[in-house]
From Swiss-Prot:
Keyword Lyase: yes
Catalytic activity entry: D-serine = pyruvate + NH4(+)
GO BP, sorted A to Z: D-serine catabolic process; isoleucine biosynthetic process
Origin species: Pseudomonas aeruginosa (strain UCBPP-PA14)
Coiled-coil residue windows: none
Name listed for the protein in its UniProt record: Probable D-serine dehydratase
The family this protein is said to belong to: Belongs to the serine/threonine dehydratase family. DsdA subfamily.
Presence of the UniProt keyword Lyase in the record: yes
Gene: dsdA
NCBIfam families: D_Ser_am_lyase, PRK02991.1
E.C. code: 4.3.1.18
Sites of N6-(pyridoxal phosphate)lysine modification: 119
Length: 448
């Protein structure tokens, strides 16, 4: 029984569950998608909230440049490159034995400064927003001051009386731990069993308290939430429900618009943009997709990609039960080499907010992630962690889908030929060399 209903009844009502339960790579194109002008109201946030977040990051830029010299060249703005990957596109055509029309680009959040993953967006933003609230409330700064003042000894001593806590499979904890420690906060990261050892080691080297669990992500989050609940000096970064995290990710879209303009890429109904986003609990891809819908409206098509062993958002939105169901309820083990995506229960906030804005969801098995990892390195010389490759099959999934999605969305052959597909590479820039060599070895052995 699942939520009081026999499993057989679930399968009868939701036939795509059979593929999810069997761990077969599958896709579902959302029949409930609505015009963005209508569906954006579901989110409960708007363009003004994203603009406010962007302005906050600008205020903090002098401090970021001071604390992290690697950001000085960008003036303390944490942003990643956008690169066309034509050789990888050709390799995918051969790999999938398909034409795959359009152009293929890679958004390299994998190489964002400070923490080397997409979590450097939302995670760092939320800690900065919390620090700003505290600093303004206690008169350490004014809104028009130079925020680099927050690196001074008296401010650090003030922040040291406060703690930041978070539950994480790895990358969010890395981002929050590093920025929290840099500002002077005490920081606790509750790490699930999936977290890589090198990420724990790196956090400890920054003076962060790492609490390890033998169980999965949801337990780590719950324990972190519980620790923070009784302490007014602890701020818990709630990856399942946080508006601040969501907005930190959403800021990426306006910046991407500028990068696309600079590259001469048009985005409109005749030149659609497909963005393929790896999804764990949902905050990162949800926030980015929200920002993209604000920026490009119905000309952008956002799809979430998950491991076959951890399809929590696909499951939650497809059944309409969101965080009420976990993959484990259906006998799916939530064990994947894509550690950043090893989440069994999705964010209900993101699932409900975005359920009419996302074009679809698809799953990828671990072996395919490793093949794609090796293929990208072989064709382009770019190295990513397995999670970051989840969006790479997306161009093939869209091109070959049999569900009537392209016809329903008016995606004619001419429009697909003019399309830009963007794979959002979520992490991998800080993976130790020995670990990366092992990833590549596994991927090459599967390819050859």
């Amino acid at each position: 029984m699942i939520l009081g209903t026999p499993k057989a009844d679930w399968l009868a009502e939701f036939p795509r569950l059979a593929d999810l339960i069997a761990l077969r790579p599958s896709e579902w194109f959302n029949p409930a998608i609505a015009p963005s002008a209508e569906a954006l109201a579901d989110v409960g946030l708007g363009a003004a909230d994203v603009a406010d977040a962007s302005a906050r990051l600008q205020r903090f830029a002098p401090l970021i440049a001071r604390l992290f010299p690697e950001t000085a060249a960008s003036g303390g703005i944490i942003e990643s490159d956008l690169v066309e990957v034509a050789a990888f596109h050709d390799a995918l055509r051969q790999h999938y034995a398909a034409e795959l029309p359009g152009r293929l680009w890679l958004k390299r959040d994998s190489h964002l400064p400070i923490s080397g993953s997409i979590k450097a967006r939302g995670g760092i933003y939320e800690v900065l927003a919390h620090a700003e609230r505290l600093a303004l409330e206690h008169g350490l700064i004014g809104l028009d001051d130079d925020y680099s003042r927050l690196a001074e000894a008296d401010c650090r001593a003030f922040f040291a009386r406060h703690r930041i806590a978070v539950g994480s499979t790895g990358n969010l904890g890395l981002s929050i731990g590093i920025i929290g420690a840099a500002l002077g906060f005490q920081a606790s990261v509750h790490m699930s069993a999936d977290a890589r050892q090198w990420k724990k080691d790196k956090l400890r080297a920054h003076g962060v308290t790492v609490v390890e669990y033998a169980s999965d992500y949801s337990v780590a989050v719950e324990q972190g939430r519980r620790e923070a609940a009784g302490d007014p000096y602890t701020h818990f970064v709630d990856d399942e429900n946080s508006r601040d995290l969501f907005l930190g990710y959403a800021v990426a879209a306006e910046r991407l618009r500028g990068q696309l303009d600079a590259a001469g890429i048009r985005v409109d109904s005749e030149h659609p943009l497909f963005v393929h986003l790896p999804c764990g609990v949902g905050g990162g891809p949800g926030g980015v997709a929200f920002g993209l819908k604000l920026a490009f409206g119905d000309a952008v098509h956002c799809l979430f990609a998950e491991p076959t062993h951890s399809p929590c958002m696909f499951l939650g939105v497809y059944t309409g039960r969101h965080e009420q169901v976990s993959v484990q309820d259906f006998g799916i083990d939530n064990r994947t080499a894509a550690d950043g995506l090893a989440v069994g229960r999705p964010s209900g906030f993101v699932g409900r907010a975005m359920q009419r804005l996302l074009d679809g969801y698809y799953t990828v098995d671990d072996d395919e992630l490793f093949r794609l990892l090796a293929l990208l390195e072989r064709s382009q010389g770019i190295r990513l962690e397995p999670s970051a490759l989840a969006g790479a099959p997306g161009i093939a999934r869209v091109t070959r889908e049999p569900q009537g999605y392209r016809e329903r969305m008016g995606l004619t052959s001419a429009r697909l030929a003019n399309a830009t597909h963007l794979v959002w590479a979520t992490g991998g820039g800080m993976v130790p060399e020995t670990e990366m060599r092992a990833y590549l070895k596994r991927g090459r052995s599967l390819l050859d």
